[in-house]
Swiss-Prot record:
Record-annotated membrane-spanning stretches: none
Pfam families xrefs: UL45 (PF05473)
UniProt name for this protein: Putative C-type lectin protein FPV008/FPV253
Residues annotated as domain C-type lectin: 49-152
Keyword Oxidoreductase: no
Amino acid sequence: MPILLKKQVSEVSCYAITVLGILCLILFTILVVVTCKWYYAFPYFSKVCPDEWIGYNSKCYYFTINETNWNDSKKLCDVMDSSLIRFDNIETLNFVSRYGKGSYWIDINQNRKIPGINFSLYYEQGVNDICLLFDTSNIIEMSCIFHERTICVKEDRYTHWYTEYMR
């Protein structure tokens, strides 16, 4: 009888070890799958802005060298999934003053004010062919047909990804 008990214990141990091994394998597989999904849920951003764009304050800025009229400047930005720059805060104004050398077409926000610059707008953008031009630290009303440089702006890749997928 004692030999029979040893055989039963041996079979039970073998069965238990097999079940534990399979459970460990299943848990390990689940761990690998979850880790991979988590890892790939957060893309690797080697660059948050495209080549030739400058990153600042969660946005990317593109300063053109070629000059175009205001309408073509707006179209150029649209083609690059961006928009003509607007000065919605003093930080953006200071950034462009520091890096943008020359005159650039700008857009204006709906309340038609630019922080840090005191001036009055008596016109609507694009009406009567008058548009806004930023020159170092001044805003100038200018005919939209003149050719000037452009600054396009868009969210950086990380900010865009975060607002798309994490909220």
